[in-house]
Amino acid sequence: MKDSIIAKLESLKERYEELEALLGDVSVISDQDKFRAYSKEYSQLEEVVKCFNRWTQLNQNIEEAEILLDDPEMKEMAQMEIEESKAEIEEVEQQLQILLLPKDPNDEYNCYLEIRAGTGGDEAGIFAGDLFRMYSRYAESKRWRVEMLSANESEQGGYKEVIVKVTGEGVYGQLKFESGGHRVQRVPKTESQGRIHTSACTVAVMPELPESEMPEINPADLRIDTYRSSGAGGQHVNTTDSAVRITHIPTGIVVECQDERSQHKNKAKAMSVLASRIVQAEQERQAAEQTDMRRNLLGSGDRSDKIRTYNYPQGRVTDHRINLTIYRLDEVMNGKIDELIQPIITEYQADQLAALSEQN
């Protein structure tokens, strides 16, 4: 491992030990803001410091074993210790490099998940409902909270559009690579000839930004309409105009929220989604102007980019970005999507490592 990386790790370890002492200080404990900030930083450093401590211990094991190589009775055991430690060091160094990669500051945020039916008519709406259930079950397995913000149901079941907020630890970092075009190939229930149809939905994942990071939005740039909430399946229909539709005139972005009975709450939620969409649109514009490793992985960053195909007759799911195919479609649609999500994250980290190696 390079001296510069070791120096960086030693610096992080010093800070970790400093924070450990601070968290035991009475003056810090009595200051909630300081204690919360130090606790968060301490938690963020914990994994990398433990990993570095293991690396240090393994190197120490090798040094001690090398001394025993001159002892005929201990030579074989010492040689084994050296080989095992060197093999583990390789794994630990790889882990350390990943832990030191620049973090996306948005990764720890909650997120907004939007699913829209695309080509395919009623079948696309049904597939949008299938994707919504898939993500909801995945969120449930992670103990995340899913909050419905807006739903436009389609006539044959499913949704023309559904927007939810997902709350939990590291939500955006786990789901951000789900943005893009999702395609389904199957025989619709209404198909009498048994022909396979292809339909599509687009998924967009955006971080929920804290107030300090929200863009300034000029009220004069907004058109706000109110209307009566349709309710879920005709139930609990509001008799007041509590649903809110906000149009950002300069960008043409439209956000609707009808989940709450209070117009004020719906407006606040819609404004939060609007802010995230404006930031996302700007980021996509910048990504279109430059080619980098994230753009290579996510395609052009356009939500219509086809990223995944769900083929029902073959029981397979294919992620086209990394040419990954798995034959457990039923499990995937029931929310077991870690084996699709984790390889993409790993590939992204590998791209980052490769880029850093080129820079160095």
Curated annotation (Swiss-Prot):
It comes from the Bacteria. One of its GO terms (molecular function) is translation release factor activity, codon specific. Methylated by PrmC. Methylation increases the termination efficiency of RF1. It is found in: Cytoplasm. Keywords: Cytoplasm, Methylation, Protein biosynthesis. Residues 285-309 are annotated as: Disordered. The modification N5-methylglutamine is found at residue 235. Residues 285-295 have a biased composition (Basic and acidic residues). GO terms for cellular component: cytoplasm. It holds the Pfam family RF-1. The keyword Protein biosynthesis applies. Its main location: cytoplasm. Belongs to the prokaryotic/mitochondrial release factor family. Peptide chain release factor 1 directs the termination of translation in response to the peptide chain termination codons UAG and UAA. PANTHER family: LD18447P. This is Peptide chain release factor 1. It comes from Haemophilus influenzae (strain ATCC 51907 / DSM 11121 / KW20 / Rd).
